[in-house]
Amino acid sequence: MLTIALSKGRILDDTLPLLAAAGIVPSENPDKSRKLIIPTSLPDVRLLIVRATDVPTYVEHGAADLGVAGKDVLMEYGGQGLYEPLDLRIANCKLMTAGAIGAPEPKGRLRVATKFVNVAKRYYAEQGRQVDVIKLYGSMELAPLVGLADKIIDVVDTGNTLRANGLEPQELIATISSRLVVNKASMKMQHGRIQSLIDTLRDAVEARHRH
């Protein structure tokens, strides 16, 4: 049995056509189903529906053989028990710092609000900048407006939400897309099966970008 961990939303919607190219079609619509384990058109393949931030955990610990996760999630997770063999080139966005429009660069110790705590600490450590990182789970844009933080680090798509709240994107930390991740033990035990799936998905990604 091959188990693939996916999260609902944009990543799922963009991944399903790629899986379909490999003959893997869910038996019911994951967006509408309440089931968290969904069989597919192949009797030996099933999908797990989990939170986006949990995909690498399920894969690293072997509860899933493969998964699809955003590079932002993988950077924050930082696990060593994963292969990352393929950039699926879907769910593209940018991981950026942002601050109030026109605000001067704060002097001294910086306060940064984000859900990407590990990414923030690494990023500013590389710059030799002292920071206090404040963990938030959502509505990052609010933090600079109410004096909780000087800047935020968040995923930016169009930047419209930032601008609507008086913020502007500033420094690019990473260009983000979704990646296929594979459990290291699964890759050894089911190498032929998984490598065949990787090759098929790679062909589907390339075909999609030729058009």
Swiss-Prot record:
- PANTHER family noted in UniProt: ATP PHOSPHORIBOSYLTRANSFERASE, ATP PHOSPHORIBOSYLTRANSFERASE ATP-PRTASE
Q: What is its main location?
A: cytoplasm
Under which pathway is this protein filed? Amino-acid biosynthesis; L-histidine biosynthesis; L-histidine from 5-phospho-alpha-D-ribose 1-diphosphate: step 1/9
Q: Which InterPro entries match?
A: ATP_PRibTrfase_cat, ATP_PRibTrfase_CS, ATP_PRibTrfase_HisG, ATP_PRibTrfase_HisG_short
Q: Does the keyword Glycosyltransferase apply?
A: yes
The record's function comment reads:
Catalyzes the condensation of ATP and 5-phosphoribose 1-diphosphate to form N'-(5'-phosphoribosyl)-ATP (PR-ATP). Has a crucial role in the pathway because the rate of histidine biosynthesis seems to be controlled primarily by regulation of HisG enzymatic activity.
One GO cellular component assignment for this chain's record is: cytoplasm
Can you say where in the cell this protein is located? Cytoplasm
Please give the catalytic activity noted in the UniProt record.
1-(5-phospho-beta-D-ribosyl)-ATP + diphosphate = 5-phospho-alpha-D-ribose 1-diphosphate + ATP
**Which enzyme class?**
transferase
Question: Source organism lineage?
Answer: Bacteria, Pseudomonadati, Pseudomonadota, Gammaproteobacteria, Pseudomonadales
Protein name (Swiss-Prot/TrEMBL):
ATP phosphoribosyltransferase
Q: Which domain of life is it from?
A: Bacteria
Oligomer and partners: Heteromultimer composed of HisG and HisZ subunits.
Comment field on protein domains: Lacks the C-terminal regulatory region which is replaced by HisZ.
What would you give as a GO molecular function for this chain, any one?
ATP binding
Q: Which family does the entry's similarity section mention?
A: Belongs to the ATP phosphoribosyltransferase family. Short subfamily.
Q: What is its EC number?
A: 2.4.2.17
In the UniProt record, does the keyword Transferase occur?
Answer: yes
Give the keywords, sorted. Amino-acid biosynthesis, ATP-binding, Cytoplasm, Glycosyltransferase, Histidine biosynthesis, Nucleotide-binding, Transferase
One GO process term, biological-process aspect: L-histidine biosynthetic process
